[in-house]
Amino acid sequence: MRINEKDTLLFIGDSITDAGRDRTHSASLGSGYVQEIARTLRARADAGPGPVVINKGLNGNRVYDLESRWTTDVIDHRPTVVTLKIGINDTWRRYDRGIISPVDEFEACLDRLLADTARKLSARLVVITPFLLPVTSDQNDWYEDLSPRTDAVLRAALANEAQVVRADLALLRAAEERAAAELAPDGVHPSPLGHRLIADAWLAAVDSVRP
């Protein structure tokens, strides 16, 4: 179903969604995939303003952090499309700080967020998969944690009839033709090209002519 100017799109997640947004300015979208999506949709709107786009990404967030602010930052805005991108920090904190985020607890929390939104809003739910493009040898070890976590994201999305944007697959395909660092210099945070690829994957999955 195509996005139209009556829609309110809300994006929430970690630093990949935040992308340097100005938190003192509610209209700030940052310089990442959210901005790219908004720019594309607004360019299509001709003389109209296009859909309302809200960015509630926050650096460093894990899934539990989203739960603590979900009502204020999501439900209260009454969006028609909610996009959630989370998971990489739940993995990363295990390796840089020894903070464990058990996959079953992660999945249960994510499921609660999606189910709560479905109960309270008539909104389309969209989940963007976490991803990793290793640029150091030790980052390859992260897949031990990230792979089952990605599976948990997919299960929670399926259980709550959320659309899935496979950012992980889009970026891995792109990495077959160029260095991973061109897409995510530290393996986690996308470059402008990486953000554009995520935006393109979202538009292909969500802004579709299919019913």
Where in this protein do the model-derived segments appear?
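Serine-esterase "nucleophile elbow" of acetyl-processing enzymes
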Residues: 1-59, 69-78
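Alpha-helix N-cap and loop-to-helix initiation/capping positions
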Residues: 25-32, 98-105, 140-148, 186, ...
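Surface-exposed cleft-lining segments at the edges of enzyme active sites
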Residues: 56-62, 91-104, 137-142
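Proline-aspartate-enriched helix->loop->beta-strand connector
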Residues: 75-84, 88
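Conserved, well-ordered alpha-helix/loop/beta-strand core segments that scaffold catalytic motifs
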Residues: 83-85, 111, 125-128, 143
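A short helix->loop->beta-strand "cap" motif at the edges of active sites that frequently abuts
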Residues: 119-124, 162
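Substrate-gating cap/lid alpha-helix
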Residues: 133-167
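Histidine-centered active-site loop/cap adjacent to the catalytic His
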Residues: 161-163, 182-211
